[in-house]
Amino acid sequence: MDDISEIWWRQITGARKFLDKIADNLAGGKSAVICLSEKTPWLDDMRRILREFLNKKFGGIKAIHRISAATDEPAQLVFENFCSDNVKAEFIPFGEKAWVKFLAERDDINLNNSCLWIRDATAAQASKWFAFIADYHKYLRGRRKGIFLLETGADWGMTDKADVEIFSCEREISDYDCFAFNVFIAAEFGKGDKFTKRYLAELVSNTTGLDVESGAECIKCGGDFLKNPRRFLKNKSKEEIERAIWTTQLKLIFPLLEIFRRDFVKKYEPLIKSQLPFELSSGKKIYAPDEAELGDLYSILGGQNLQQEDWEELKIHRDARNKLAHLSTLTLEDVQKIFK
């Protein structure tokens, strides 16, 4: 599973489009702000792949420079690092916006051929950089020169400015992207039959949500995770985990129970008909074979001449349905019996 981050950032639709949009925006001469949450998966790999996309888009025209966000004066930092001494000597600090106006108007500075990537900015630092970048593009008046990629946290509160677009990882990547990734990873790397792999993917999706990096670790552990999810989900309460397990089982197990019921009724329809109408202990009467639920069939056919294996299967499926119907969860052993 060494290449699992590559699958996420290159093949999963939402994640790939997130990087493509950023790269296209920057290649078009605009700047970008990317908002990343604490759950943004494989951050270093994301940066590496995005840099690769950018280099292909730039085609050698622009160089990417990593810049520290930790500065009180972004304009002065850019001025000091991307202007030659001769250019600096011509600068006259005439007002608050003098630095940024000077940078936007000069045609002979390294900034014009650069993409400045500002990483790990706090909210306060990001606000200063965003204001500087927006002013820079305003003074450019539509011309294409230097561009900026500002990386900050998910709690960003600003909106797009002219030629400065904000991209949010949480907005661009959906629950379905995470689910599709989990299904793919479980199918490729999980163990067991197709039902067990699907169950693993569903349960991981229901317990880890958008935290796909944690989800991938759970899938990697496979059977150990299915036996004891709480061991891998320290940040989830017992109630949250039980609810996720029940939701997963309801989605996957209930249809299989209904398929079993229909097949069972079809196989034993003459025998069932011979016992009808049948009054249950609840007072409910069964008049047709297809009206009988699993528990009803167990009552109707009790003591009849059924194949032992079929009788055991009926009991297993009846018990499973009763548990799920009463908001209880099945053990992994119970689930595997149904899948079998």
Task: State each model region's role.
Residues 47, 73-75, 339:
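Short alpha-helical interface elements
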Residues 1-17:
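Dynamic helix-loop-helix/coil hinge segments at AAA+ ATPase domain boundaries and subdomain interfaces
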Residues 26, 45-48, 78, 106:
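Terminal accessory regions of large proteins
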Residues 36-39, 63-73:
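A short hydrophobic beta-strand->loop->alpha-helix junction that borders the nucleotide-binding pocket
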Residues 13-16, 20-30, 37-40, 56-59, ...:
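Amphipathic alpha-helical interface elements
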Residues 42-61:
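P-loop NTPase Walker A phosphate-binding motif
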